[in-house]
Design a protein with these regions (language model features):
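N-terminal helicase ATP-binding lobe
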Residues: 1-214
Length: 214
């Protein structure tokens, strides 16, 4: 299946029975030999679809070479709860259209809605969508709102074999700098499986992601 066919099927709705066509930059993301670090595009042209459907295509339909450089887990980090809910709804709808709901899990990590069982099957592909406090605290081995005895599990799973996507970075504050430093340390110290970070915004300022190790 080509990415155009994949994207069209995923975006089919009652109002758009033929689905939508991807923009050229979305196709480049899905089919490219490497993943970008920055995505700076205007509001309303599909950043969320680029990250989720692009990652999903690379894992499920692309060549073995592309799959091998695409992390097993997609970690979608957002600054606000409402954005988490919107992104979750989109991901679930796209997976249902693609008939992948049973094979790729969507798990939400935010206050009051912590997905407590997402770590039970680390071998499976998964989409983790959460607020930056929940996700970054776990990546720092200080998991907010969870037993400290489970901190190392989430620390390991969120720092290995993951594609971290930071969306609406202009709203993240110091969390943005933390994401960059974490990626710098992963690159410096090495990880199990490919671990990559992507920063996305319509008003992307790259200065905060230049840190001591990144």
């Amino acid at each position: 299946m080509t990415f155009v066919e994949f994207f069209t099927k995923a975006t089919t709705t009652p109002n758009e029975p033929q689905g939508r066509q991807p923009y050229p930059y979305q196709t480049v993301f899905a089919e490219g030999d490497s993943l970008p670090e920055l995505l700076n595009v205007p509001t309303g042209v599909g950043k969320t679809a680029t990250a989720i459907l692009g990652w999903l295509y690379r894992r499920r339909e692309a060549t073995p070479k592309i799959k091998s450089i695409t992390p097993r887990r997609l970690v979608y980090c957002l600054p606000m709860r409402t954005l988490v809910e919107q992104t979750r709804d989109c991901a679930q709808e796209w997976l249902a259209n693609l008939e992948l709901s049973e094979t790729v899990g969507v798990h939400v990590l935010m206050g009051g809605a912590d997905a407590s069982n997402w770590d039970e099957h680390p071998e499976r592909e998964a989409i983790l969508i959460g607020t930056q406090d929940m996700l970054l605290s776990r990546a720092l081995n200080r998991g907010y709102g969870m037993s400290r005895y489970r901190w190392p599990m989430h620390f390991g799973l969120l720092n290995n074999d993951c594609l971290w996507v930071m969306d609406e970075t202009q709203l993240m504050g110091v969390g943005l700098i933390t994401t960059a430093q974490l990626q710098g340390l992963r690159s410096k110290l090495a990880t199990y499986g490919v671990t990559h970070s992507l920063w996305m915004s319509a008003t992307l300022d790259t200065s905060p992601i230049r840190t001591v190790d990144h």
